[in-house]
Design a protein with these regions (language model features):
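Repeated scaffold domains used in trafficking and secretory/extracellular systems
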Residues: 32-38, 134-139, 186-191, 226-235
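Short, solvent-exposed loop/turn segments at conserved positions within beta-propeller repeat blades
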Residues: 7-9, 51-55, 105-107, 157-162
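Blade-level signature of beta-propeller repeat domains, shared across WD40, Kelch, NHL, RCC1
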Residues: 231-254
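Entry beta-strands of beta-propeller and related beta-repeat scaffolds
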Residues: 1-3, 43-47, 99-101, 146-150, ...
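Loop/turn-rich, solvent-exposed surfaces of beta-rich toroidal or solenoidal domains
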Residues: 153, 179-210
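Asp-box/BNR beta-propeller loop motif
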Residues: 10-29, 59-79, 112-130, 155, ...
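Short glycine-/Asp-/Thr-/Trp-enriched loop segments that recur within the blades
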Residues: 29-34, 77-87, 130-135, 183-187
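Solenoidal tandem-repeat scaffolds enriched in leucines and small polar residues
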Residues: 54, 64-112, 122
Length: 254
């Protein structure tokens, strides 16, 4: 089965199976706009959306997507005016070992974490570009409960190398920013290569497709092709999507 989540209002969530497609959630609020959806296992899934009354919208399922419910106002992260989740690549959510992370951008760029299936949250400021609607964290990935990376920048100035990434080795409590010399500009999506011990990553941007073999501190270009989103099927198979194209790459370790 798979799920489809529309953007705009009304926000519609469909569950598709061989037997057919079913609408499982509908949000008619005039400000409803959902940005990212992720399943943490075959039962628990989460979707997050732009703030309403200063609160991030958080939608969850506990039965494999058959039914969905919003977290209450007090259970959702409070966002600053102009702060939101970006919908660039459906990678603003990460989940490892029962811990959940969501990144934001805009007027402020932060990472929110939860260890109780999105009932309560902690927040940490990120050292990424921020202060404008086009700036912030666009993508987050964790290899394990300690090692993670956030990437983004300014999508209107994709060549700007300042404030485009940061790395953590303590589960997101602290973040070390990438220097401009070690960046390649705005990033829409970053993923760890499975079974790489957290050393190998792939990232995509308007500047091309890049890879790292040292946890994300240094990058080399794989291709000048422009992609917006990435997904590893396994450690040897990477799917990349862009404007009117989907490519499959075979990852060869050396």
């Amino acid at each position: 089965r798979f799920f489809m989540l529309s953007i705009g209002t009304p926000a519609l969530l469909y569950r598709a199976e061989p037997s057919g497609m079913t609408e499982v959630f509908r949000d008619d609020h005039p400000l409803a706009f959902y940005d990212s959806m992720h399943f943490l296992n075959d039962q628990f899934g989460i979707a997050v959306g732009d703030p309403i009354d200063s609160r991030m919208q958080v939608l969850v399922t506990h039965n494999g997507g058959k039914t969905w419910a919003k977290r209450t106002w007090s259970q959702t992260p409070k966002l600053a005016e102009g702060e939101a989740v970006f919908a660039a690549s459906n990678s603003a959510i990460a989940y490892i070992d029962k811990k959940l992370w969501v990144v934001t951008g805009g007027s402020a760029s932060r990472i929110f974490s939860s260890e109780d299936q999105a009932h309560s949250w902690r927040e940490v400021a990120l050292p990424l570009a921020q202060g404008a609607p086009t700036k912030g964290a666009f993508s987050v990935a964790f290899y394990d409960s300690k090692h993670g990376i956030v990437m983004g920048g300014n999508y209107e100035q994709p060549a700007d190398r300042n404030g485009t990434g940061a790395i953590t080795d303590d589960g997101g409590k602290t973040w070390q920013p990438l220097t401009a010399d070690n960046s390649f500009g705005y990033v829409s999506c970053v993923k760890y290569v499975p079974n790489s011990k957290g050393y190998a990553l792939v990232a995509c941007s308007p500047n091309g497709l890049y890879y790292s073999t040292d946890r994300g501190y240094h990058w080399q270009r794989l291709s000048a092709e422009v992609y917006h989103a990435l997904l590893f099927i396994d450690e040897q198979t990477l799917i990349a999507s862009g404007d009117e194209k989907i490519s499959i790459f075979r990852v060869v370790s050396r």
